[in-house]
Regions:
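Glycine-rich loop-to-alpha-helix module at the N-terminal edge of alpha/beta enzyme cores
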Residues: 32-122
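Basic, gly/Ser/Thr/Pro-rich low-complexity segments located predominantly at protein N termini
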Residues: 17, 25, 99, 122, ...
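Residues at the start of alpha-helices and the adjacent loop-to-helix junctions
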Residues: 4, 8, 23, 40, ...
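Conserved small-residue-rich beta-alpha loop and adjacent elements
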Residues: 125-155
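Hydrophobic face of amphipathic alpha-helices that form TPR/SEL1-like repeat modules
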Residues: 1-29
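Glycine-centered flexibility sites
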Residues: 12, 20, 31, 94, ...
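Short glycine- and Lys/Arg-enriched binding-loop motifs that mark or flank ligand-binding interfaces
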Residues: 8, 16, 90, 113, ...
Length: 155
């Protein structure tokens, strides 16, 4: 079995960690090294943040319809590659492949489609009148790039 070299995906391109370091990725079911993953550091995080922040300029101006369509395209692409995603997840976690398509990959597809639908369900509420002859309202706007580290390979 050949050992794959994994890379970070930043600004639409696959790139190695700036340090050049990698770490073995081991299949827990058989103990074999099947990939090398980049050991990313502060410089890699900064590069990813800057790329995401630049993309945010366009994304934040997208209409609800455009955002919805983008999420639907992501869901469709994931669904089209469900078998491949299940193979990758099984190899990475040791989970039985037989359950991964239905209970993880397709559940993820469903969640993305749910939020795609929510993208067009805009909610605005009028608030109390704080000044005579003025109407106040609540407006939700994108705030920018965030980071998240999740445990146990979820969600």
């Amino acid at each position: 079995m050949s050992v794959r070299e994994l890379k970070n995906f930043v600004n639409g391109q696959y790139v190695s960690a700036q340090s050049g370091e990698t770490s073995d990725v081991i299949n827990p079911a058989n103990g074999e090294v099947y990939a090398k993953a980049p050991v990313s550091g502060d410089a890699d995080i900064d590069a990813a943040y800057k790329a995401a922040d630049k993309a945010f300029e366009t994304w934040s101006q997208a209409t609800p319809s455009e955002r919805q369509l983008a999420l639907f395209r992501i869901a469709d692409a994931l669904e089209a590659r469900a078998e491949e995603m299940a193979d990758v997840e099984s190899e990475n976690t040791g989970k039985p492949r037989s359950t991964l398509v239905e209970y993880e990959v397709l559940v993820s597809v469903d969640q993305i489609r749910f939020f795609a639908g929510a993208a067009r369900n805009l909610e605005g509420r009028a608030t109390a009148e704080y000044a005579k002859d003025h109407t106040s309202s609540i407006r939700r706007e994108p705030i920018g790039v965030i980071g998240q580290v999740t445990p146990w390979n979820y969600p």
